[in-house]
């Protein structure tokens, strides 16, 4: 600590200034606070980045205390006093509750507080005992809680990392409570962030699972870096300060502790058979890899994956489990709907409707569970021969008072029941009314089970009768969104009634039943036994799904599961993906079916009063029965308490044992650890889940923890061991280890593909280079063909070749993407125009060939023109020097990724062509999975804050955000990716399928798995839509010039990449001295800046600029610096990945090592020490080595060449056919073209451009508007003009050339759009417009459009109305 005393500055005398560099704090003492002091504080904080605390500084405003009390308004009763001591504001508060409440208020009013208090003021709390009268007030009081207690730790010296050692008492983030004290805080590290600046600061985020804290390391960063990692438990010691309204620890010492992990210490481990991951749609936060890692740490032999409704995590789960050496069990928690349930039950005889007696009944009860709830009202109506002949009604006094909730639902009060008969008195009488009738009810299971159970309780009878459910009848006979009794009554037009009173409900249900009888008779159903035929017509969307666990037993089972999942998304999706019970029965081979949670069919039936015989019948369907810890139900669950759940589980155990079924205890895992519950709460908060904050204990449990929970239920150690350890392991042993994907390519089959590719390649090679081929060509072609054919990739080349040829024959050029241009075979087959050979001359006549080994020429297009020394014909120039390895790996075994850019207009036709080639059921769009991004996760956590009223610390918010980030939101599709299934396989051999984002109107199916996970098994063809080929097609149509024939060394075209001279415009007025506005890849402000700095003079340099602009950390903070410092020229720096391999091989490096270095660098992995050493041995320049270290991503040269080739062709038309260029540009890229502004002239355009350029944070529309106006201004400066839309001349969508002007199309009129524009042209082609009235009558034009057209002169001399004359 450095100290300076009695320092005078301006008019201020400083008693002392103390500097603590370890804490990054400056303590200043002054006699009186003033504006000069405030200015000095700001200056010091800005220049030093230290925190400045002013001791003794108090604003002169004597009313400061009053203003603070005013700010705290409603909290004033809890404040005993406000005291200023030096730089401290001490709030003396009445009790712990007051402290917490006021601290929360201070955080929410931080901005106002900062304006009131002098800089550096520390806020302290002093808790005093509240007076008796305050405690008696009707205000929320906390439970009396003790001052947070720290723990004493024994610290080993070898664990100490640096600085001060921990204090005797150590706190955790949720227990800290005093500021400005030397404090030690223990927690788990969940984030480490390094902030670079004048001073480097390391932020360490600690948590104890309840709260989190930011710890700042200032001057000892190098002592900490690399010494602690995520997941470590540390003790950080330092000054605990209030910073930005929340506690922050300024670290002066760190000690690492051995982590006290939850571990599974059971000698025999359990198996988890029910777990959800982040792929369960916005419901779970378990990371797949962390789940498997934990299972491995605990020694579990196997674990299952059962996400809600999908299996998208399977590929990731398998890879993680395989690496961990544990058995992966694939599964799903399905949304099962029982489409096989009977409409009429217990029917033991047959009868016509007329000869049967029906009793339609309804009960009002105290709750939903017949085991514990009671009947309080009976209403019943008897029907004979289609007529209502009798009624029964009574209220019943229950054994205990009814709840307020029951009264609210039923309208029955306790007073109404006081003098009524008991159920024991009523039931015998009601049974007499029922006689031998068939019972009818709406949602009949509910009423029937209550009646049967209470007959058993009261009379000891095992009573069963046939019963019909009008709910099931409604789902068979009506099409509705809701089948509640109210909705059905309304649908049938039966008038209003008083719902939730038993007799009223029974009467109206009787009317509903009689109407249904009429409807059944009309479709030929006249007997009771025939009612069952209706179940085949039940709408699956009307059936309520229940949970069901399905596990994959073998490969056949996996395929069957994929089929079921596919149908659930494609055929039966309604709110959730539904699996029909009938479909599961049909595809059950290789699957094990579990009863799932208490929301499953079996659990639900048990809670709704099903008899043992009913439960046995339901349980027979399942291979195993699940029970779960009682605390997987939230503590305040209204409809189910834990004692009742215990009874249900014991009953299910007895039934399962009787049926010889396994009973297993599962965890219904949704997060890994108990402390993660808040993360799931934050995930559910914005989703309308009313009980989100009270999270059940859905964490992964150890064997001991699960045994303890089993004992709570069964109170028997043998049963506990059976359900926790033995049975789950037995099920795991029944399951084979299945590999979902083979990680080897299954290409589609095209007969003789190998021979065709070889034949086409050689034929074209001979045509271009002659027979015999030059040695360099022969070797390259043979090497590539051998790699392509031997690894089974010929079919990929053939598909791409056919696609490109089809597009070209239809008049649309195709651009290549990625590294396909690295392949000479691809070039010879016409897949790409990029020739990867070294720069060379070739003669089209006599086949003379010569490679030019001259470092001045990086591209064949740059070679000087020459005539053939043999025959005198002009030589062709080509070659871009791209190694094949960048495409298919050093061994030529990497799956070739052929990406093609089709015209946006042609893309759909290209996709249809692929479908025709292989069959629609063998071509699917490449699926994607969209997850919650970090920014969106912040929104979830903010919603959690708002709904709970809990202000979170920044560190705790970071913790929750990290848990939510990556949770699946929805699905989508790759913009052009097509996955091809070989003809000898089904798609279900690889993946389920679905609609993208579950949109039935999408018209296409996607792979259920994200395409990246199946990329190694299936061929993916990228047929993307792009503007540039459309641009080229329109230019070709406008000029009649084939763009593939233009000279790629045209000097004027090349010149616009470094000046505006060929355009003939003033660079000052254009505000650019390069002419690339509107040129793809070169028109952006960033790339134009690169062009200005580098002034490229060759095609090869344009390729370098393209590579530099598409890489990450390749130009800025890298190549640009080496050029400016004079270490290298543009032609020397690393611009594309291929540059590294070529340069190192040129230096004499062994090619395989050069390839490895290139691969490392392009992926942002830098270079190893061994690689660096080898580079230095070959005298590779230091700047080159440093450049490799800085690069995060490198663009492939082949991709850059393809982009530049397309751009150069478009630029050629801009220079030599300007109006055609501008017509095409504004037609295709002019979405933000504003005719109203443009027609005002040059000065108005310049003004708007200045406004746009001055804007910060422009959205996409504003950026596009700026780009369009730049091209508009350039066109005008070149001497051309725009003509307003004309009702007689304009096209719907295209800019038309008229003399030296462009006629604006109709769709550029604001608010008009393509549809209206096309209607105008269509009507005009039928016959000319005769009036405005005629125009509006025959088109989609409205009054607002007409007003705009009038203002711009679009209507010309068109009269307003029809004019008729006799002569």
From Swiss-Prot:
UniProt subcellular location: Cytoplasm
Leader peptide range in chain numbering: none
One matching Pfam family: DNA_pol3_finger
Domain Exonuclease: 358-513
Keywords (A to Z) from UniProt: Cytoplasm, DNA replication, DNA-directed DNA polymerase, Exonuclease, Hydrolase, Nuclease, Nucleotidyltransferase, Transferase
EC number: 2.7.7.7
InterPro entries according to UniProt: DNA_pol3_alpha_NTPase_dom, DNA_pol3_finger, DnaE2/DnaE/PolC, DNAPol_HHH, DnaQ, Exonuclease_RNaseT/DNA_pol3, NA-bd_OB-fold, NA-bd_OB_tRNA
Reaction(s) catalysed (UniProt annotation): DNA(n) + a 2'-deoxyribonucleoside 5'-triphosphate = DNA(n+1) + diphosphate
Gene3D superfamilies in the cross-refs: 1.10.150.870, 3.30.1900.20, Metal-dependent hydrolases (3.20.20.140), Nucleic acid-binding proteins (2.40.50.140), PolC, middle finger domain (1.10.150.700), Ribonuclease H-like superfamily/Ribonuclease H (3.30.420.10)
GO cellular component: cytoplasm
A GO molecular-function annotation: DNA-directed DNA polymerase activity
Major subcellular location class: cytoplasm
GO biological process, one term: DNA-templated DNA replication
Role description: Required for replicative DNA synthesis. This DNA polymerase also exhibits 3' to 5' exonuclease activity.
NCBIfam families linked: dnaq (TIGR00573), polC_Gram_pos (TIGR01405), PRK00448.1 (NF001688)
Family to which the UniProt record says this protein belongs: Belongs to the DNA polymerase type-C family. PolC subfamily.
Name this polypeptide is given: DNA polymerase III PolC-type
Organism: Thermotoga petrophila (strain ATCC BAA-488 / DSM 13995 / JCM 10881 / RKU-1)
